[in-house]
Amino acid sequence: MEINVGMRGEVFSFVEKEDTAKEVGCGSLLVYSTPCMIALMEGAACEAIEEAMDESKTTVGTELNVRHLSATPVGMEIRAEAIVTAVDGKVITFEVHAYDEAGEIGSGTHKRVVVSSQKFLDKAYAKL
């Protein structure tokens, strides 16, 4: 199977105390943190193309442009979705969105690159 424009992924999570800006260390309030929202969006992107990936390959995030639009309290459900909008060789571009139970909380674009899992790990650990 190949990666095509229009592929979609969706993931869900509930906001826990450890997901808050205060606990993550990027703010002082007990509201859903931007880093956790971004991680969920990246998870949705991975989900969108998971079935098309060869077992020896993976994707790595290389670019992200996201706006966090609204605060979400602990206890609410979050849904993130990603849609493939372009495929240029090994570079995959996604439109990403996140929602809580009251509406959209984040949106943007995300790029991932297809890599050989083993070669990528070898290169990373060669730094040691």
Language model features by range: what are they?
Residues 1-32:
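Catalytic strand-loop segment that frames the active site of acyl-thioester-processing enzymes
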Residues 14-16, 111-115:
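Short beta-strand edge segments in extracellular beta-sheet folds
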Residues 46-79:
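Hydrophobic beta-strand-centered segment that forms part of the acyl-chain substrate-binding groove
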Residues 66-101:
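Hydrophobic beta-sheet segments that form the core/acyl-binding groove
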Residues 97, 110-111:
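Residue-level structural signal for beta-strand termini and adjacent loop
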Residues 113-128:
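C-terminal output/interaction extensions
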